[in-house]
Amino acid sequence: MKDLLKFLKAQTKTEEFDAIKIALASPDMIRSWSFGEVKKPETINYRTFKPERDGLFCARIFGPVKDYECLCGKYKRLKHRGVICEKCGVEVTQTKVRRERMGHIELASPTAHIWFLKSLPSRIGLLLDMPLRDIERVLYFESYVVIEGGMTNLERSQILTEEQYLDALEEFGDEFDAKMGAEAIQALLKSMDLEAECEQLREELNETNSETKRKKLTKRIKLLEAFVQSGNKPEWMILTVLPVLPPDLRPLVPLDGGRFATSDLNDLYRRVINRNNRLKRLLDLAAPDIIVRNEKRMLQEAVDALLDNGRRGRAITGSNKRPLKSLADMIKGKQGRFRQNLLGKRVDYSGRSVITVGPYLRLHQCGLPKKMALELFKPFIYGKLELRGLATTIKAAKKMVEREEAVVWDILDEVIREHPVLLNRAPTLHRLGIQAFEPVLIEGKAIQLHPLVCAAYNADFDGDQMAVHVPLTLEAQLEARALMMSTNNILSPANGEPIIVPSQDVVLGLYYMTRDKINAKGEGMVLTGPKEAERLYRSGQAELHARVKVRITEYEKDANGEFVAKTSLIDTTVGRAILWMIVPKGLPFSIVNQPLGKKAISKMLNTCYRILGLKPTVIFADQTMYTGFAYAARSGASVGIDDMVIPAKKAEIIAEAEAEVAEIQEQFQSGLVTAGERYNKVIDIWAAANDRVSKAMMDNLQTETVINRNGEEEQQVSFNSIYMMADSGARGSAAQIRQLAGMRGLMAKPDGSIIETPITANFREGLNVLQYFISTHGARKGLADTALKTANSGYLTRRLVDVAQDLVVTEDDCGTLEGITMTPVIEGGDVKEPLRDRVLGRVTAEDVLKPGTADILVARNTLLNEQWCDILEANSVDSVKVRSVVTCDTDFGVCAHCYGRDLARGHIINKGEAIGVIAAQSIGEPGTQLTMRTFHIGGAASRAAAESSIQVKNKGSIRLSNAKSVVNSSGKLVVTSRNTELKLIDEFGRTKESYKVPYGAVMAKGDGEQVAGGETVANWDPHTMPVITEVAGYIRFTDMIDGQTITRQTDELTGLSSLVVLDSAERTAGGKDLRPALKIVDANGNDVLIPGTDMPAQYFLPGKAIVQLEDGVQISSGDTLARIPQESGGTKDITGGLPRVADLFEARRPKEPAILAEVAGIVSFGKETKGKRRLVITPVDGGDAYEEMIPKWRQLNVFEGERVERGDVISDGPEAPHDILRLRGVQAVTRYIVNEVQDVYRLQGVKINDKHIEVIVRQMLRKATIMDAGSSEFLEGEQVEYSRVKIANRELEANGKVSATYMRDLLGITKASLATESFISAASFQETTRVLTEAAVAGKRDELRGLKENVIVGRLIPAGTGYAYHQDRMRRRAAGELPAAPQVTAEDASASLAELLNAGLGGNDNE
């Protein structure tokens, strides 16, 4: 037996390899793979079912059909191994060689490989510098191509039609050489001198100035260099020998009834062989040219169809009218080789069943049905039975198990003990979708699942199924226990909060037992401790909610980690005292001394984890669950129709609203308001009414009046069941209660617009037919949305995983000083996310100073944990520069310091953690909770009134950043800068609120002044944009000619007149070139200069501007010279939810992006064209002016003569991330993408750590474009991996050479996935054909750095425990050690095996 094992070990020899190279196969190489030429199209003999000789299934070429048996049956058995039968020519060996032996077909005429021809950009076309159309005409025998011009005036690779060719033949005779078909193309490719061509192109590149030409030349140079470096020959793109796939990979299977099922490839091969043989015959017969030509064309088409059916012309179809599946189709798509068989395989030792609740299980257990366990652990049971001597052979053991003898169950118990199993629920959206549990054997057929892990699986018990997998090897069991056990996954990797959190019943139970009630039985008692409290409650002496005093002993950890006891009498309730019994030592009593809602319970577990660690938390979580269930059952909380209390005020509120609507209707009929205004007002009225009803309803539900001990009335929080469920966070929400007991409110039509008559009824009162009908639409839309959402969200996750899969933590510290500055997220008056939440678990990039001093508060490279964050908060620090993966300097992967804390474990991240995949899962998993729709601004959905002032909420001092302002005549400040920000700072120096202040706003308070809460600090007119003068003087009109550039309008009511500047479109011919402006002069008529510059103060007026001043009027600084009406922002759709996230990660340019200043300087306008104006920015320090054409309809934020900085907004709109990167740098674009993505998730209440989004951004910034190559081998304008530029520059600098300059590129995630260094990963993602073609031509090496590549080639992935294995391998190879080789040679092993087999299985074949 030992020898047998040795032999098997020797058989499965593992190849040690580090990279995989892909290249073009030369004809000789194809022949060297082949075991013989396939000459006939026959497959198998229809009578004998034996393969035909020289056919597609020929046994002589591909190997025997039966193990160790030749075709004619002369040689059978192992002893003849390796003999070649002289009768039928078949080698006697295993039949599995039919899976690996290839054949070949010698093509009678060369044929082009369709991938290199048609996969755009066409490689053959690029190499020959001929249009694809022309090449196709040559290949398919429509025209000739000149191969050798000789002494004639014909160029090489010139295309000739039939007539031109005949004329040339007459003229020059055989001076020149022209051919058609693939031979011609092959000859052209063969005669190319790649190096010389390359030199010539490089010279051309240096001379040319045209952008398009440069692009084309660089493309050709890259291709030619790829050919030179990879050792591929261009003529190999034309096939002369066609390889034939091994027959077992394109099987022919007999069905019952004498029919055969065959792979489509056989049909395709048959066509090729038939046409090839016919062509050979025609050539032997010297048939007329036209016939041969036709046959060659047909051969070319047959080969095309075999390689990639349907790529050119119509796809070849089989008998059933469906296109045949070609070789290319075999590997691409979801059903192709990559995604179906290499990335996702079915596994053995697995089962699935329905899940039910296991409320009595411990957190690390799951209930496994005995039937399933018996089947899954069969091999272990057989082994144990044999080991114990209970069964003599495996066969006997098998019989015992089938009979289910009593002893088998005992053995099963033993086998299962301490052997974890994996439970998985599809869809596995993040890594918590597969966790390990210890199985507990149960009766029945359903798997029992612990209720607390349902949140991680997103499982419920309405018929969900789960799969069970058994880790077999010791290593697998170890990993399952140490890494995947449910008890080790308490925190969510997405945000670091507990994910093992009680929900629903448990929350309700805990909430109920921690509530207090006035005048409950037993109120005012003083108890000796929690035990007495429980005794009183059990014996009925006191109610759960009674307010009592209890003696409580708390334990606190001191500096040495010892517990210190502290006992005191505390006011609490009986229920809370009982709950205290399960709280672990070391937590304060205050944690349970409050009504516990879902949030409070989550916080409680989190605190427990941070203070006490993993084990106590797990035990605590389990105990909370048992307690919660028990007390939920005792509470008797149920839902009855009387719990839905309808507010008494409802009828009168609705009546009032109806009266208001009637009034608006009258105004509309008398023509005072437009139809649109009426609609909007009606909807506003109803939205307000709905809010009032729901407020009245909640007030009503929230409190109830009770009599206290002294007989007085007192208000207390209600014990209404529905209210308790919503308040505790167990089930339901205020919005749902509103529909039950308030009014349903406004509904939307299918197109998203709001129906102006609301549903005034609620579900308790019931809906009438019309109301019900209006409601059905929304319900159906919800279902349709969900279905779409799931698919879209899944696709987003797939793209994210693909772009980030090769990002792994590879070193401890890269030593970079870079980082990104974190500030709290403040929108308007509220802090959306405090600084603490953003920097927790990050590493500081520089010393954090105490505000206002030079003292170091936190040193550089400190991991900010909870304690450090408390220090930051105490010192009211409001910006911290932290390390970030985006700025990490590691070449491949990132370093632990730049990543910071591993969110799921709570300590700094380990090397080898696959942070890319974790990030992708964390962003993708909540994708299904995001909305799918784009919101139309319409109705009450989201109509914010145009803001016209800033009102602060808190008291504090004002700070204005990047503000310019002037003082107007009444002494107020007027803002004259564009992107001014107003921050409110409280007395500790913390930023509380932040607002944008528009140009022309009048400030009531200035920078640094104190304000009280509720004070208005700035106001402006939202409908017009003013032009404000910065200097005082007299107005002088220039180019303001009545009737040409301006018109005078008089208001009928007031009699005031104003001038309106005409748009250039409305002007007469004479006024086209005039530039109306207001100039400011002093009393003597000299120009006044703008302070701090030598520019005269003159303000050019755009079209539609309104001037209310006359020529020569005196004005003071800060006055409004003119007003430009703002068109209200139109009703732009806000893209929200999932599509918005996808747009951000795909880095799509918005429709009308903001126009940003490319350089810093002074703005002026050049000559206008028909629809555009010319913006010129002249740098202050001289240098070339930058020009840009801007469409006239864009509203500009700058006036002529204004100074702008690089990256300033010139015209409003959504900013394009590419512009932000180009003009403001990596930090700014990171901040933009992170904040925008977070906005979408925050709206849905989903918490994701910023890190994850930064990880994806890092991958989007993977490429750089070379601006100037320096001494490197890069080409100018070439797009290369950023890490490669960094490494190259480091080497160049070390050798004192000129390094390359580059610009970072932002790629969308799909683009970035396809642009990865690894062609295996890219090919398995999308566009398989294109990726493989490109890689083959370039002769690419895949270094197998990422996860995906390694999964595909079947190695351990370089992450987690596989990371150590790969590091070890590298180390051993560097040290020159060889992997331990098997001690036994193959010859010895096979000999001993033969002996064994012949001895043991000699006579009896009839087992």
Swiss-Prot record:
Recorded E.C. number(s)? Answer: 2.7.7.6
Cofactors (names): Mg(2+); Zn(2+)
Q: How are cofactors bound according to the entry's free-text note?
A: Binds 1 Mg(2+) ion per subunit.
Q: What class of enzyme is it?
A: transferase
Q: One Pfam family from the UniProt entry? A: RNA_pol_Rpb1_5
What GO annotations for molecular function exist for this entry? DNA binding; DNA-directed RNA polymerase activity; magnesium ion binding; zinc ion binding
Q: Which domain of life is it from?
A: Bacteria
Q: Which transformation does this protein catalyse, written as a reaction?
A: RNA(n) + a ribonucleoside 5'-triphosphate = RNA(n+1) + diphosphate
One Gene Ontology cellular component: DNA-directed RNA polymerase complex
Q: What does this protein do?
A: DNA-dependent RNA polymerase catalyzes the transcription of DNA into RNA using the four ribonucleoside triphosphates as substrates.
Q: Which family does it belong to?
A: Belongs to the RNA polymerase beta' chain family.
PANTHER family given for it?
DNA-DIRECTED RNA POLYMERASE (PTHR19376), DNA-DIRECTED RNA POLYMERASE SUBUNIT BETA (PTHR19376:SF54)
Q: What is this protein called?
A: DNA-directed RNA polymerase subunit beta'
